[in-house]
A protein has these predicted regions:
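PRPP-dependent phosphoribosyltransferase catalytic core
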Residues: 130-192
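Active-site-facing substrate-recognition patch
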Residues: 11-45
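Charged, well-structured alpha/beta interaction segments
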Residues: 43-64, 122
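Short, glycine/charge-rich flexible loops or terminal/linker lids adjacent to PRPP-binding catalytic cores
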Residues: 72-112
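Internal catalytic-core helix/loop-beta-alpha segment
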Residues: 103-133
C-alpha cells in the first residue's frame, strides 16, 4: 500500500495490485506478434500505428519482435498523436500536451493496425479514426491493445487483438509500465 498526503494533511491509501508481470507481458507480446503474422503474413500491405503517448511503447516492442524474432523485414511503424482530435480536449482544467505524429508513409489503401496500451472508453480510438484520415483512406483498420477494460466502453469499439481482458471498477485505473520508460514491464490495477 502507498500512503499519499495531499494539502491540509489529508491522507489517502492507494493500493496497487499486479495484473501482469514482466514474464506474462513477454508471453503476451509474442502471442500478439504471432496473431499479427497469421493475419498479415509479410506485412507488405499493412502498417502499424502506435497511438501516442503510451501505445507507442507497445507498437515499438511489437515491431522489434516481428523483425528480430520472426524475421519480418521492414515493418512500417507510424506514431499518431490524437490530442486535438479528442472530444474532451477543451473540457480539461489544464491544457493537454501534444505529442509528435510521425507517419512517413502513405496509408491510402493499406491495412492499418492501431496499437494502444489500454482500451477503456473507446474515445481515444474514435479520435485516432478521425486523425488517420489526414494521411489517406486505409482499406481496413484493426485495433490491437494490451489490456481491454471490457465493461467500460462509452462507444461501440472492440479490439481485434487483445493481450488480456480485465474487469475493474470505475474507481480503479489500469497502469501499464514499460521497461523503456518506467524501468520494468508490468501492469497494475491502482485505486484512484
Amino acid at each position: 500500500m502507498l500512503y499519499i498526503c495531499i494539502p491540509n494533511n489529508v491522507w489517502y491509501i492507494m493500493s496497487k495490485k499486479i495484473l501482469l508481470s514482466s514474464k506474462e507481458i513477454h508471453i503476451i507480446l509474442h502471442r500478439l506478434a504471432c496473431q499479427l503474422i497469421e493475419n498479415h503474413t509479410d506485412f507488405e500491405n499493412t502498417v502499424l500505428i502506435g497511438i501516442q503517448p503510451r501505445g507507442t511503447y507497445l507498437a515499438e516492442r511489437l515491431v522489434s519482435i516481428l523483425e528480430n524474432d520472426y524475421q519480418i523485414p521492414s515493418v512500417k511503424l507510424g506514431l499518431l498523436d490524437i490530442t486535438f482530435y479528442r472530444d474532451d480536449f477543451r473540457r480539461r482544467d489544464t491544457p493537454l500536451e501534444a505529442n509528435k505524429t510521425n507517419i512517413n508513409f502513405i496509408v491510402e489503401d493499406k491495412k492499418v493496425v492501431f496499437i494502444d496500451d489500454v482500451l477503456f472508453s473507446g474515445r481515444s480510438i474514435r479520435a485516432a479514426l478521425t486523425a488517420i484520415q489526414s494521411f489517406g483512406r486505409p482499406s481496413e483498420i484493426e485495433l490491437l491493445v494490451l489490456i481491454d477494460r471490457r465493461f467500460s466502453r462509452h462507444l461501440p469499439i472492440q479490439p481485434n487483438y487483445r493481450g488480456s481482458q480485465v474487469d475493474v471498477f470505475d474507481e480503479e485505473k489500469v497502469s501499464v509500465h514499460w521497461q523503456e520508460r518506467d524501468g520494468k514491464d508490468a501492469v497494475y490495477i491502482v485505486n484512484k
